[in-house]
Regions:
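Flexible phosphate-sensing "switch/lid" loops adjacent to ATP/NTP-binding sites
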Residues: 1-278
Length: 278
């Protein structure tokens, strides 16, 4: 499972990279995101109707060399403004709720059971599920409702990699703070750290990495450089074009760039050991 210290840390991109890497290694792999908020949709035809899932999960499916499946994104929230969202469950939207009502009467009662049902179904069909978290797992005001992060990791006994964006500053504080804010029973699921979007000589980070590893008791598996690539974003405010406007060949080339960069800058053997995969 890929979680981040914040929104925009690079979770989606890392899942894209890992989907392609594990597909290249011969594994049958599927992406999954329990809950996503976006207006960037991908439409899947199912039971003679079109159902909606987040566009970024469709890109991740492409990286895994499989067809997008509505089960990859059970809960989709489409922001409508004025604290109101359309709630799309299993690709079907027929409910509009405020954030307060969503957390009070929907997320645990209806959303999470659907998440577990779809995830269990996908697990039976794949060697590996790469779960993307949402935002930060340490939003302590939402810990009891955060089905996209540690509630799901705890329920499924998932191994978590924590990714932080160093470009925006405050990376090391965000890493340590995120891990320290997690309850002890959830903290144990974090198995490693990824520093993302780095520019410069990696050696300048050596002392800081040693200190972070000592404070968190977790290894920094990789420092991923910031590179130019062109892949659709999940952010509803992002202006990148939709997946449908990318040619298959071009998108595949961009996915390979991301995967190659991750592979070259990450301790892949350590990652495989975490997952108990050869």
């Amino acid at each position: 499972m890929i979680q981040g210290t914040s929104s925009g840390s690079g979770k989606s991109t890392l899942v894209i990279a890992l989907c392609r890497i594990f597909s290249d290694l011969g594994y049958k792999v599927s992406p999954f995101k329990a809950q996503n908020m976006t207006s960037n949709f991908h439409f899947v035809k199912q039971k003679k109707s079109l159902r909606r899932m987040a566009g970024i999960q469709a890109v991740q499916a492409t990286a895994a060399r499989i067809e997008p499946d509505i089960r990859m994104n059970p809960v989709l929230l489409r922001p409508l403004g004025d604290d109101l969202s359309e709630i799309i469950l299993g690709g079907i939207g027929n409910l509009k709720l405020t954030a307060e009502d969503y957390y009070k009467s929907f997320v645990l009662q209806k959303g999470f059971p659907k998440v577990l049902q779809d995830l269990d179904s996908l697990r039976k069909e794949n060697d590996l599920i790469l779960i993307e978290g949402a935002g930060s797992p340490a939003e302590i005001n939402l810990l009891n409702y955060d089905i996209a992060n540690m509630i799901l990791a705890e329920r499924t006994n998932s191994k978590v990699l924590l990714v932080a964006d160093i470009e925006r500053g405050g990376c090391f504080a965000a890493i340590v703070g995120t891990i320290k804010l997690l309850p002890a029973r959830q903290r144990k699921f974090v198995k490693g750290i990824i520093i993302n979007k780095f520019l410069g000589q990696k050696s300048i980070l050596n002392n800081a990495i040693v200190q972070v590893e000592e404070m968190t008791k977790r290894k920094v598996l990789g420092v991923i450089p910031k590179i130019p690539f062109d892949i659709p974003s999940e952010d509803s405010l992002d202006q990148k074009r939709a997946k449908s406007s990318y040619s298959k060949r071009y998108l595949d080339e961009q996915i390979n760039i991301v995967a190659s960069t991750f592979r070259k800058n990450t301790d892949m053997q350590y990652l495989l050991n975490i997952l108990k995969m050869k």
